[in-house]
């Protein structure tokens, strides 16, 4: 039985790998994609997502989502992904268009039509998910769980303590973490370990057309290097769905700091239970790196 999932994303180079795995991993049934502003503007993330769907000839509906965070000015990660979000490869022209409704309403409608609860996967800022939960609370029973790439129990990657996807819209993340839905958090504690080695990266052009495309994108990706290895942050959320045995999780109380001058966007992960609050998130703290790398190679070999 394939697991039905909806994917909320902000492509983004590592998003492209996660999208490939979500489409082609035989255990998963990707039924809806939505885009959000994050790595680059929502117009660019939508264009990039449509380009990828066309590249793989995937007939998956896509809805464009939030262009700005809930309450603050937008920030991006163009320094990591390039100004377009997916520089380095010339995709062919197409005439695909997003659905005519906002992402959170597309998610709501698809949830309400689904014959069983659906797993949501969010690998960008949580703006669309927060809008869904705040504007359409009747949808909560139809959400099996939410798996996110975001946050950290330790160091950050855009401030000393904050990870980009959470820091891009802390108010949205705080709303989601308070919502009461089941959450699995794949943060920097595991994603910084999720490295594709230079030896493997060098084989991609010979793998298939997707390997050639990803190799071209990776030459513009700044989360590591082709010489030292590249971090596949977003792919961890998809990997957990298929291979949860590769991850070590701990139930923790997690809150999001929205006010601090130096700490805004920090996920406060109470690993030791100091606050005495009930756990609201399953936090991934460790990764079987060799197993992850083997799984990635197996999945990408399935992609045409």
Curated annotation (Swiss-Prot):
Source organism, top-level taxon: Bacteria
Transmembrane segments annotated in the record for this chain: none
Keywords recorded for this protein, A-Z: Glycosidase, Hydrolase
Gene Ontology annotations for the cellular component aspect, listed alphabetically: cytosol
Protein EC: 3.2.-.-
Gene Ontology molecular function terms on file: purine nucleosidase activity; uridine nucleosidase activity
SUPFAM superfamilies on file: Nucleoside hydrolase
GO biological process: purine nucleobase metabolic process; purine nucleoside catabolic process; pyrimidine nucleobase metabolic process
Active site positions, chain numbering: 233
Enzyme class: hydrolase
Recorded family membership: Belongs to the IUNH family. RihC subfamily.
Functional note: Hydrolyzes both purine and pyrimidine ribonucleosides with a broad-substrate specificity.
Protein name in UniProt: Non-specific ribonucleoside hydrolase RihC
Organism the protein comes from: Escherichia coli O157:H7
